[in-house]
């Protein structure tokens, strides 16, 4: 299932970009969805705050079709006002106890494809962060990347370190400015004796900033922050109880609580702080459990929009915030979908306003 990585793949990075392939918007749409025209792509208004922040959007490299072109998505991300982009690279292992982690032959991009998209994003004027995440192909009950417990920890860290080295090489040769050394690995974050050589190896390969992304419910105890340059949090905070209304006042109160908690934790800390993921599915109830990736639910494009608007109202003027990455641009928009992407939905307007206000 996993693709071997090595010098042969690295040689592909220097190759000239392939000619453009068909736009992703020409691919078949999921059944039962409604096409919405993309919202106007005129340049976003200039930022109103003088703070030099990462105005970012995450782009999942999730296409299974090898002919898929990310170029049109990059153009949309620039048009919505992003100055930074996180290229999300899914890595796979069998379950939480395995150490067979690697790039999936069908569900992960090749290193050459990652390099091509990173170069294209840089040509479009964006700063690039390479952002690996771990997914489980056959998870047991309750398992996800936050509960990893490999039977052979040494083998897992060796393999993961090899992968980060390969991704760091791509990031270096393409001029990326940031590399995430991990995301939401809550059960492994305290193992600094194994993390330290991994991070040191990556630093020898990649000259840019290293980031770690902690889960929204685990950031206070993340010892791994001590080894990196920027502290990230995936911003899936519950903004309300399931029985509470999803109105502006309730959502703003939820974000104010989260902001107070984060700012109390940040007191005395010196590393830059960013939201590495800020995303909401377009379905009813999303603001009560933004982290819930489960399929199904009732589409609700307005609750998604209100969630982004609430974040803008509460956080856009926060002096201690160094950046935000919207999760996630990949995917089709439309009235019949419940996905995270804001493309072609009312949330796209709010994302434009949010990035412009940072």
Per-region residue spans from a language model:
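Aromatic- and glycine-enriched glycan-recognition loops and surfaces
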Residues: 63-79, 102-123
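Active-site neighborhood of glycoside hydrolase catalytic domains
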Residues: 163, 188-212
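The substrate-binding groove and active-site-proximal loops of carbohydrate-active enzymes
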Residues: 58-64, 98-111, 149-159, 182-189, ...
């Amino acid at each position: 299932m996993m693709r071997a990585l090595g010098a042969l793949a690295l040689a592909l990075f220097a190759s000239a970009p392939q000619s453009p392939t068909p736009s992703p918007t020409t691919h078949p749409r999921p059944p039962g969805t409604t096409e919405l025209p993309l919202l106007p792509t005129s340049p976003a208004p200039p930022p109103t705050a003088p703070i030099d922040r990462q105005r970012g959007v995450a782009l999942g490299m999730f296409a299974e079709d090898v002919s898929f072109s990310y170029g049109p998505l990059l153009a949309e991300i620039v048009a919505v006002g992003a100055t930074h982009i996180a290229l999300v690279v899914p890595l796979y292992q069998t379950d939480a106890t395995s150490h067979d982690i690697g790039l999936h032959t069908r569900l992960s991009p090749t290193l050459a494809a990652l390099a091509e998209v990173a170069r294209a994003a840089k040509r479009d004027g964006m700063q690039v962060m390479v952002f690996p995440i771990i997914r489980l192909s056959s998870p047991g009950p309750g398992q996800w990347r936050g509960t990893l417990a490999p039977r052979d920890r040494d083998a897992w860290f060796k393999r993961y370190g090899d992968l980060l080295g390969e991704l760091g090489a791509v990031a270096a040769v393409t001029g990326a400015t940031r590399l995430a050394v991990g995301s939401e690995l809550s059960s492994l974050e305290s193992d600094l004796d194994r993390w330290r050589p991994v991070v040191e190896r990556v630093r020898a390969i990649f000259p840019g900033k290293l980031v770690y992304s902690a889960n929204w419910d685990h950031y206070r105890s993340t010892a791994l922050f001590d080894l990196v340059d920027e502290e990230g949090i995936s911003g899936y905070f519950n903004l309300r109880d399931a029985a509470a209304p999803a109105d502006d006042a309730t959502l703003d109160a939820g974000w104010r609580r989260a902001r107070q908690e984060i700012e109390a934790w940040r007191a005395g800390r010196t590393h830059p702080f960013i939201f590495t993921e800020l995303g909401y599915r377009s379905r009813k109830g999303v603001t009560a459990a933004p982290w819930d990736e489960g399929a199904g639910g009732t589409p609700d494009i307005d609750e998604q929009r209100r969630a982004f608007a609430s974040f803008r109202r509460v956080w856009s003027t926060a002096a201690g915030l160094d950046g935000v990455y919207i999760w996630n641009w990949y995917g089709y928009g439309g009235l019949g979908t419940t996905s995270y992407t804001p493309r072609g939905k009312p949330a796209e307007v709010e994302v434009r306003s949010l990035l412009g206000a940072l």
